[in-house]
Amino acid sequence: MERSFTVECPPFEVEISHWDRILPPTHSKRILCFSLPETTDKEKVVEQLHIAFHHTVQRLPLLAGSVVPFSSHQGGRPWLRNIIPEGGAQLIVKDLSEELRFSDLAKTNFSQHLLNTEQLCPLPEVGYFKNESVDVCRFQANFIEGGLLLVVSIIHNAADGRGVTEVIKIFANELSKAQSGETHYPLEPRPDVYRTDRTKLVSGHGVPGSIENHAAWTSDPANAHAQIHNVENSCRTFRISVKALSDLKKSLSATSRGPDEWFSTNDAISAFIWRSIMLARHRAGILNGDAETYVAQPVDCRPHLEIPMPYFGNVIYMTKSSVPLSDLADFESGLGAAARALRADIKGVTAEKFRDLVGYAERTALETHTRLNILEAMSTSGIILTSLFKMDLHGMNFGPIFGDGHIKALRLPARGTQAGAVIVLPRVPDGSCEFMVTEQESTIKCLLEDEYFSRFTNDADSIGASSEEVVAPLPQPPITSEEGMISIDSTPPVIEAITIKSAPDIEPVTIEAATTEVEPITIKSISDTETVTIGITTTEVGPASTEATSPVVEPSTMESDLVEPVTVGTTNSEVESVTTETTASKVQALTTISKEWHLVPAGDVKMPSTLISNRIDAPQVGTIKIIQLNRPAAKNALSVQMVHELSCEIEEIHNERHMGGTRALVIASAVDGVFCAGADLKERKDMSLTETQAFLTSLRGLYSRLAALPIPTIACVSGHALGGGLELALCCHLRVFASNAVAALPETRLAIIPGAGGTYRLPNIVGMSNALDMILTGRGVPASEAAKMGLCNRLVGADGSEDTQAFSNRVLALETGIQLAEQISDAGPIAIRAAIRALSYSCEAVENAAYESVLTTKDRKAALAAFSEKRKPILVGE
């Protein structure tokens, strides 16, 4: 009986929110388990399902759309997606009566081990991450002996957990209408265009936001979507009966610190699961006794934002609570410690907090992915706990074909979940609680052997293991206070009752990853040893020229002494040639060079082994940070260590929380004749494929974070900037080239392509034609030609002998970059950041929001007053 019905996409104009866009293209898969009488007319049921599905799509045409990645003109970021009115919604029908019996499922309480994802689900993959469209929604009706398994698959970009529940509610209503004859064939399309703008209800409203305000979230680089993977044979559903749930609430209430402290039913369930899983992981040898444990929980912000119902889109805020394992292990207070942490974080969620996070995600949308930071800890110290407990799916009436009209169970398929994912299912009609745990087998075994856990889950109503799941007791490591293990007391105490109040609803979200940081060592500044006098030629570079380009330096002849003349012909600017001798104070402040270290000796100096990092005072307020690449033996090639150390420097700026910190960043070379030679191929040749992929992930993450900095960034390029070295410069807002600079993306000559942003950042700067020329030929572009095509914003050249020219060009490029940073930093700190934000989006809405953010600043008032008084304003970033 296998067949498929397609409902063509009705016309719609839907503007999804940014909060919808950033979710990975994974589908929520809910398996609704119905019983059917043996005499059921399946053909009649199929007709009614088809009619109901058709009318559900007409009411919400978005369900028949397609999810597509952002196009190149929208920024082409892999973490952003749109929903377009193309394609259709599918209802697939299968008859599996010879393979599955409802009675067998009921005996195991609908165990996930009997529910084959590939067989039952219309979109079985964990996620659809390729650059192609994927359906928003598919339903699959699976007839089994004595029942029907209806699978609802809706992509997360279209609806969050409550949104999916609302869709199911609409379908239940339409199915009842079809059975009563209120709706029937022929099926008519929707006559009008469905229009909605979710951004009016869910947005940051121009709030810039700060990621530091949100413990569960990060924008640290990582290919989080790639870490979502299948986990099989480690998924199990448990039940807490009504009596056991009452006992559990009493156990938690006994830990209350007074009448002003109360816990919800959800707090009791969540704390119990959190504590039990972490102790089981400890017994399984996965988690050390001194570990900090974490749980992330999604909170539905519809009530906080006062959003009218139904609203289908994503309005989820994720909290992150932490408690040391040693505290969880305390039998008398562990449950209370967990619940107390959960309650505090849930109470801390407000409309303002949600908008702050969304505002940050909107502001940084094209440069970095705002995501959850718990993914990497999911198999060790963290879990994500999603509660559907108050979503009344069991109360929905799907019509008389199912007897009483109600589902007998709701299940989620095991495939597509990962260790650390916990789902609390909707409250069962008898008042009991079911929850699904996905863990490593060793953890599941330890859970089953935990007397305290079994006390609440192993009564007559609880779910027993199927025959293939029955396991022998696991040999447990000694539980002592030594070597990271902790002592766990499993003797239950005597408990008294206290009334428990209810909890806010909680919704599911998608899972992302995190990275760690290492602080570089700080050392004292190095004394100056020698000064040099430099003759300079400076060129302000205007718009890209349409004139013929200069002769090309091919990679085979890329020597540091082969450069084009400094003079540049452009259509809109003239070359200004200035040759001067710097004054003693200028040399002391900017160009005094240590022969050994090649430092600009101002401010504190940090020297990780591959970098030289220091600061100088910025005009008005704050400092200018200067980072010099310093691997002379490897021509500043990007090693694993250099990428890590540079990431730490960039994150240090991201973590600053005040305007008086870093005002601008200058990146230069401490090595004559080269800016950066690209990836360290000597190091690369000894890497495995996994190590190479990990390095590329780190490099791409570094470049995304550099490009996402809210302050001006300037690359000072002297000598060769090849491959990843040029891509590093492309991440900066501005580029200063010395006359000996040679830029190239030669990867095609190595049978690869640029892989760290070159293919999309370069055309945004020099245009598609020039980018194609550079990438397809792999040729080296000299400084003068680079200036003509707009690759650099300043072109400078040094006079002097051939022996000193490479050194002089490097120093001059750095000096010019610092002067440019000082010139920018003389303006208002808030205004500079707002301008960068507006330019990053290049749209009216963001510009308007950015302008609003500067209207009420003290700096604006100070600037207006200074203008009236004909003096220079003092702008401090307030």
Swiss-Prot record:
What is this organism's lineage?
Eukaryota, Fungi, Dikarya, Ascomycota, Pezizomycotina
Look up the record and name the pathway of this protein. Secondary metabolite biosynthesis
Family indicated by similarity: Belongs to the enoyl-CoA hydratase/isomerase family.
- This chain is encoded by the gene named claC
> What is the organism of origin for this protein?
Penicillium crustosum
Residues where substrate binds? A677, G678, A679, D680, L681, G724
GO BP, sorted A to Z: fatty acid beta-oxidation
Where along the sequence does the record put site: Important for catalytic activity?
Answer: E747
Class in the EC hierarchy, top level: lyase
Descriptive protein name: Enoyl-CoA isomerase/hydratase claC
